[in-house]
């Protein structure tokens, strides 16, 4: 099933003239790399599986033959709910070879998410593991088939246990001959639908063309001087933009090696880094924090590491400084599934840039900061961040109204993130438009208050959310996770700490909840809607006991 992609003719002509867009597809780039280095290791995972470029191509070609035999045509959606395994790349490449659209799904999704997303994207084939994390995902999906009428085939990825209820991927690869003729796909056609893991609401399907992905990853590799000599370590989920684009796609575009980790554990991650001599690691702030804590207690040889690229959330200064002391070059990157990545620091930027900014526009990308009416703001003023470039998505799948709100006719994507830009074009993300607490008419940035909380010596993790207040409308509530050595923290102690920080009193947290952990999605973002639900429930219980 094809999807009509609306391309702005002027933008398309400009990007083609500048060389960011062309006729070639991702499959064309794959074959260029394959011809150049067939015997090089392309991908390896922590379960011991590895493929050279040649063996990976043969496996993907066999799977492509099977997909075509099932009636799969260019534009049809193929979903795969896999962790960081080599088989993810096999399926992805098979989609490219057939012209099918890749729809990677998160392993953590269960019945509700799967039914909704698979129907939304009208997937015709789903690949799921026989077992993973003490569950059997394939057995979870089979009883749901009646609720997903468009799903024609379900394939069991029998990596950790045998397939008994669905066709096994391993057998399909053994029994099916390789594809003899590649399906021709144009660069303007849809390559992938990535469902955003937003902290609120149902996931939205972000539509990316081959040209979107190629321009994004080529610019990303160029800015960071990534080459065929590099080895990428990807601990983040491959169902998100970070893993899918930077952990799987970018390496094969430049002939590099991809090292995948299915379950993040700092010890396992460091062991892989040391064993495979990885040169770059990509992940959100929680990954960095956990690796740092582990390194401080159990040193590993990380001399091969060129840098750790950190995105998803702003890097706390303390973490950046600790990384520097441990010999880790920490670089900030900013982007979203809709526009990924579009701001990156330079490799040779001074530490002040890493600590105080989220980078500047990638090649071909424009960034501006706008007010509520979407008028550009002067340097230094806070407003909404917007980006335009060859990497920017084509809209949300079957969501024209949402697409129109986020993406204007001139190609600008409005992120919903609050931002400041300096005179050199470097940006600093300061929060979310929706992440503002309005207390008696005064706006409080949750990010600002969280940054102060994270400086408290007893606090390991923190989040600020609004709690309802009859008189002021909203007050701020702090959810904190304490460091292991500390057993308690009171609101009075927090207020005293804020007093020492000399910030306006209206920014002080007015309620404190100490928890064991904060709810995060797979990309590391705090799910604040769950915290808002929790504080409303807690307040209701307090009233009931009065």
Q: What feature does the model see in each segment?
A:
Residues 8-9, 132-187, 295:
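ANL superfamily adenylate-forming
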């Amino acid at each position: 099933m094809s999807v009509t992609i609306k391309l702005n003719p002027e933008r398309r002509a400009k990007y083609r003239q500048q060389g960011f867009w062309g006729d070639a597809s991702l499959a064309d780039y794959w074959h260029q790399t394959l011809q150049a280095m067939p015997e090089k290791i392309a991908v390896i995972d922590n379960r011991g599986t590895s493929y050279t470029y040649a063996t990976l191509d043969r496996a993907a070609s066999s799977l492509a033959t099977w997909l075509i035999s099932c009636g799969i045509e260019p534009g049809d959606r193929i979903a795969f709910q896999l962790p960081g395994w080599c088989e993810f790349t096999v399926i992805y490449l098979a989609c490219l070879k057939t012209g099918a659209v890749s729809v990677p799904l998160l392993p953590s999704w269960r019945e509700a998410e799967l039914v909704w997303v698979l129907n939304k994207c009208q997937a015709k084939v789903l690949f799921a593991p026989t077992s993973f994390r003490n569950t059997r995902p394939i057995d979870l999906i089979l009883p749901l088939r009646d609720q997903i009428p468009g799903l024609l085939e379900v394939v069991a990825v029998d990596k950790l246990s045998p397939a008994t209820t669905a066709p096994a991927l391993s057998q399909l690869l053994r029994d099916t001959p390789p594809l003899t003729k590649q399906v021709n796909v144009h660069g303007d056609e849809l390559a992938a639908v990535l469902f955003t893991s937003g902290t609120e609401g149902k996931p939205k399907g972000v539509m990316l063309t081959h040209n979107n992905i190629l321009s994004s990853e080529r610019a990303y590799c160029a800015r960071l001087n990534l080459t065929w000599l590099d080895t990428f370590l990807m601990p983040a989920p491959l169902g998100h933009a970070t893993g899918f684009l930077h952990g799987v796609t970018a390496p094969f575009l430049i002939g590099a090696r991809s090292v995948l980790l299915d379950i993040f554990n700092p010890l396992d991650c460091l062991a892989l880094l040391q064993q495979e001599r990885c040169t770059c690691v990509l992940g959100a702030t929680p990954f960095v924090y956990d690796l740092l804590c582990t390194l401080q207690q159990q040193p590993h040889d990380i001399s091969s590491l060129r840098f750790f690229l950190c995105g998803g959330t702003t890097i706390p200064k303390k973490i950046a400084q600790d990384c520097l002391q441990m010999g880790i070059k920490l670089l900030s990157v900013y982007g979203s599934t809709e526009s990924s990545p579009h701001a990156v620091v330079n490799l040779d930027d001074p530490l002040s840039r890493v600590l105080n900014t989220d980078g500047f526009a990638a090649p071909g990308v424009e960034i501006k900061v706008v007010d509520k009416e979407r008028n550009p703001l002067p340097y230094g003023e806070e407003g909404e961040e917007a980006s335009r470039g060859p990497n920017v998505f084509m809209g949300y799948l079957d969501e024209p109204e949402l697409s129109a709100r986020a993406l204007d006719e001139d190609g600008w994507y409005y992120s919903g993130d609050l931002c400041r830009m300096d005179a050199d074009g470097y940006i600093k993300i300061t929060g979310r438009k929706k992440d503002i607490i309005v207390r008696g008419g005064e706006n409080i940035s949750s990010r600002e208050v969280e940054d102060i909380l994270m400086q408290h010596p007893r606090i390991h993790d923190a989040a600020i959310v609004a709690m309802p207040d009859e008189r002021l409308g909203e007050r701020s509530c702090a959810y904190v996770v304490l460091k292991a050595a500390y057993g308690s923290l009171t609101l009075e102690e927090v207020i005293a700490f804020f007093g020492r920080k000399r910030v306006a009193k209206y920014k002080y947290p007015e309620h404190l909840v100490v928890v064991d952990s904060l709810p995060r999605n797979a990309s590391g973002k705090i799910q604040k809607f769950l915290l808002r639900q929790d504080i409303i429930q807690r307040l209701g219980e307090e009233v009931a006991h009065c």
